[in-house]
A protein has these predicted regions:
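Surface-exposed binding/hinge segments that line
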Residues: 100, 122, 129-198
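N-terminal low-complexity, Pro/Thr/Ser-rich intrinsically disordered segments
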Residues: 16-42
Length: 198
């Protein structure tokens, strides 16, 4: 039956009491209607925090994704397009993904002042934080655990540590994170993820 409200079997094709001329007037007036009006959705709730890696609330995530860029984003047609990554691809049918980060992307503070260049190490640091049980107590780790090689093992490893030991961990070259997790940064603007499955 779809959205028409009709059952699809029999029934009237015109609303009761409308003749053909009344319908023609209705069609003419509808051509003058506004068809591309956009009304933004505003949240009436406060954002709990600005750490996009930690948030557990949908309304937080909606707001934060408007002010944070990822490697890729989705265009209005639902296609992946460049954001911080200027190019990306795989050479082994999806087991390994390489992202080339655009040079000149800056981290800015709340006032819009440039603080630092965004580079591949920033993504490694972010992933280490998400996968570190003691640093990220929100437990929002399902996607990286299910997708990235060694992510679940690293998460379980950090669980076995004291809070102090876990907080001392980093994502720097030669770290336990780099040893265990399928992420490489061969240079400042190249990021490689090794996945569990295609």
């Amino acid at each position: 039956s779809g959205c028409s409200g009709a059952s699809g079997e029999g029934g009237e094709t015109e609303p009761p009491g409308e003749s053909g001329s009344a319908q023609e007037e209705s069609v003419e007036s509808s051509s003058n209607e506004i068809t591309d009006l956009v009304i933004p959705k505003l949240s009436t709730k406060e954002i709990a925090g600005f750490n996009i890696l930690y948030t557990q609330k949908g309304e937080d995530f909606e707001g934060l994704t408007s002010i944070w860029d990822g490697l890729l984003e989705v265009d209005p047609e639902g296609k992946l397009v460049p954001a911080i990554a200027e190019e990306w691809g795989t050479e082994d049918e999806g087991l390994t993904w390489t992202f080339k980060i655009r040079e000149g992307v800056k981290w800015v503070n709340v006032n819009g002042e440039e603080m630092a260049d965004c580079n591949a190490q920033d993504f490694a640091t972010g992933l280490e934080w998400v996968l570190n049980f003691h640093k990220n107590d929100s437990l929002n780790t399902s996607m990286p655990l299910e997708m990235i090689e060694g992510a679940e093992e690293y998460y379980e490893y950090t669980k076995s540590l004291s809070k102090e030991e876990a907080y001392a961990l980093t994502a720097e070259e030669g770290s336990k994170f780099r040893e265990m997790v399928g992420l490489e940064t061969p240079d400042d603007y190249t990021l490689i993820y090794r996945c569990l499955d295609k």
